[in-house]
């Protein structure tokens, strides 16, 4: 692993620090991107289909058409992000050539490489990756991820998986901080994570990069709950544009993230939103056991 204090790494991490306290919304069109910007989102994630649609479609889910990203970049002044398939470094190269603000190496799309994640150190563009536990988060960081997010259960409008992943990481960090120095080395081996990042996490008492919630956030209350559990910000997918009133829902979630510890404001922004996305309690077979990351995903390529 490259030295985490390398200037390029610090630059990417520093950029992500500026996103703290913000909301990033999934969008499919210029119109949706403008709604997100007007609502106060700090960024938009450009997709061909939002996660709820991807769950119900057969076939391969790939990275977005670059022309759509380019079109949206011209129409909004906030950050523009897009997803690539796990391991698909060429999709990432294409997005970097577009000068996109951030790349999400995402399990929401069809996996491209079962043996490797992308070596994110090779890119100037910062990456965000999903995790379900501390070991997974630190492995992604060792590969060059500048931001971590929960995997959650995208497209369901059901927050249960995201909360599980948040609490898992929090509890593992709490346990790590209780260990003696000699015990830390055994713990690092047990979770298959680089010892330098494990030691840094213990020192900081948190992940060494920005950490957002994602996967199933559908209401202002969901977003505020994630923030109260220690998240730095929130990704919202289908919860905005599958709701009855996307403009109002978007603005309310942004306000909830900014005021997550103020019940009075949370009450106010939760009133008269119209119907939230219908949602689903079904966990997809593809990710039913994703709390135990596939052992193949250990090294970048």
Swiss-Prot record:
MF annotations from Gene Ontology: amine-lyase activity; catalytic activity; glutaminase activity; identical protein binding; pyridoxal 5'-phosphate synthase (glutamine hydrolysing) activity
Binding residue positions for D-ribose 5-phosphate: 26, 155, 216, 237-238
InterPro entries reported for this sequence: Aldolase_TIM, PdxS/SNZ, PdxS/SNZ_N, RibuloseP-bd_barrel
Gene Ontology CC terms, in alphabetical order: cytosol
EC class: lyase
Keyword Lyase: yes
Superkingdom, natural source: Eukaryota
GO terms of biological process kind: amino acid metabolic process; pyridoxal phosphate biosynthetic process; pyridoxine biosynthetic process; response to singlet oxygen; vitamin B6 biosynthetic process
SUPFAM superfamilies membership: Ribulose-phoshate binding barrel (SSF51366)
Keywords, ordered alphabetically: Cytoplasm, Lyase, Pyridoxal phosphate, Schiff base
Active site location: 83
EC number(s) given by UniProt: 4.3.3.6
Pathway(s) the chain acts in: Cofactor biosynthesis; pyridoxal 5'-phosphate biosynthesis
Reactions catalysed: aldehydo-D-ribose 5-phosphate + D-glyceraldehyde 3-phosphate + L-glutamine = pyridoxal 5'-phosphate + L-glutamate + phosphate + 3 H2O + H(+)
Residues binding D-glyceraldehyde 3-phosphate, per UniProt: 167
Subcellular localization, as worded in the UniProt entry: Cytoplasm
Annotated function: Catalyzes the formation of pyridoxal 5'-phosphate from ribose 5-phosphate (RBP), glyceraldehyde 3-phosphate (G3P) and ammonia. The ammonia is provided by Pdx2. Can also use ribulose 5-phosphate and dihydroxyacetone phosphate as substrates, resulting from enzyme-catalyzed isomerization of RBP and G3P, respectively.
UniProt-listed NCBIfam families: PRK04180.1 (NF003215)
Similarity annotation: Belongs to the PdxS/SNZ family.
PANTHER family: PYRIDOXAL 5'-PHOSPHATE SYNTHASE SUBUNIT SNZ1-RELATED
Subunit structure: Homohexamer and homododecamer. In the presence of Pdx2, forms a dodecamer of heterodimers.
Protein name, per record: Pyridoxal 5'-phosphate synthase subunit Pdx1
Gene: pdx1
């Amino acid at each position: 692993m490259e030295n985490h204090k390398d200037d390029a790494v610090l630059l990417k991490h520093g950029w992500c620090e500026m996103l703290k306290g913000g909301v990033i919304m999934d969008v499919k069109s210029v119109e949706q991107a403008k709604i997100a910007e007007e609502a106060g989102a700090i960024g938009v994630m450009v997709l061909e289909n939002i996660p709820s649609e991807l769950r119900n479609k057969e076939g391969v889910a790939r990275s977005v058409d670059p022309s759509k990203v380019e079109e949206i970049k011209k129409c909004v002044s906030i950050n523009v992000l897009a997803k690539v398939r796990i391991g698909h470094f060429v999709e990432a190269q294409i997005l970097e050539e577009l000068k996109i603000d951030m790349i999400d190496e995402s399990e929401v799309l069809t996996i491209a490489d079962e043996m490797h994640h992308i070596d994110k150190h090779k890119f100037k563009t910062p990456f965000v990756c999903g995790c379900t536990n501390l070991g997974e988060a630190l492995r992604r960081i060792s590969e060059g991820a500048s931001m971590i997010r929960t995997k959650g259960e995208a497209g369901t409008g059901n927050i249960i998986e995201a909360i599980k992943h948040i609490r898992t990481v929090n509890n593992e960090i709490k346990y790590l901080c209780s260990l003696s120095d000699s015990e830390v080395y055994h713990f690092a081996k047990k979770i298959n994570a680089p010892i330098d990042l494990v030691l840094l996490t213990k020192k900081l008492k948190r992940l060494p990069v920005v950490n957002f919630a994602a996967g199933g956030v559908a209401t202002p209350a969901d977003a505020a709950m994630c923030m109260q559990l220690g998240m730095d910000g929130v990704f919202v997918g289908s919860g905005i544009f599958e709701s009855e009133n996307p403009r109002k829902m978007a603005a309310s979630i942004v306000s909830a993230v900014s005021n997550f510890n103020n019940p009075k404001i949370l009450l106010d922004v939760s009133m008269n939103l119209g119907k939230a996305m219908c949602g689903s309690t079904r966990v997809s077979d593809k990710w039913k056991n994703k709390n135990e990351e596939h052992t193949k995903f250990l090294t970048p390529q």
